[in-house]
């Protein structure tokens, strides 16, 4: 979408140009600038079993979350381009990390990753493209298998000279204090003098697609903390115009730096999982299994650095790869139906398995979902999650989300 379509932004640009000695016509200044972004409103309500003064009590909480993002991409010439993005977020304050639904804890603690209201320039980088190679320098998305939507300052390069194969490499030396990095807590800073986000991140990856087979191969190293590896192999088949089936398998491991592991008390881990999926006309379904475990059953570990990365996942709250204890294995099924000509999808997930030392505790999660796609720009999502655990720590969460993208 061209900047000309945004009257407010155009007015601001006009004001700035009016004060510049070398001002150029507004249409000339904005003709190669694209604008995109979104506005999102969330309401989340939680109820969980917590220990208060050595007694189990139901604790409830609810909060609103407002987030708005606007990105500007300017074409400098045939090779160079520049990107800047501003973001406003209200997330309700501190994020608490602790033992919950099989999650481990590197010593416990609360890390307030952001103020209640935050306005920042979350993206600002220069890019250069020549042939099938693009290099980007500055504040940008950390593009890797082990992260979801976090940002960092550094260098990212992408090449697609080989048909069907994309190669990537990154180096980041200033990582965003993202709330989904469960290991980014006060206890680690106290023990080592640094948060995990204060360490440099290096990564390489390969993504291939040769119909019907696709694959990914990734390695990332967080300096003096942990090395992460993941491989994925998948296949998708079109049986006919109305039926498609897919298969996907993944394996990964985490190898912690010895000094860091000894200081914090963490251990290496392994992950493997598979998923089968099918779409039949208006129906969709999937089934799969994931196993992620620390090498020492009494230790905590991780498979993903931020959120769930690109690992197979079902449900909403029970399965967590960013921080966990002991052995964890779950199987899952999902199903949904999209009502024709309405934009409405109704679905459900069921996850069942065990967690903890030697998988001592059984746990399950049921998720009910309703999505409504009003048009290409406006979407609504609602889901309810209920977790039942042998340990007696039952949790439920409700979320409503409205998102407008442009």
Where are these regions (language model features)?
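Solvent-exposed loop segments that connect transmembrane elements
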Residues: 49-58, 98-112, 174-196, 254-265, ...
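Glycine/serine-rich loop-strand microenvironments at binding/catalytic pocket rims
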Residues: 23-38, 42-50, 56-58, 204-219, ...
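Internal metal/ion-chelating core segments
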Residues: 159, 165-235
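Detector for outer-membrane/organellar transmembrane beta-barrel domains
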Residues: 209-212, 234-356
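Structural signature of outer-membrane beta-barrel domains
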Residues: 42-46, 89-93, 142-144, 172-177, ...
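Outer-membrane beta-barrel proteins
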Residues: 57-60, 140-150, 222, 252-254, ...
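Solvent-exposed loop/turn segments connecting transmembrane beta-strands
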Residues: 118, 142-154, 173-178, 196-200, ...
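Beta-barrel outer-membrane channel/assembly domains of diderm bacteria
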Residues: 2-139, 155-160, 211, 233-241, ...
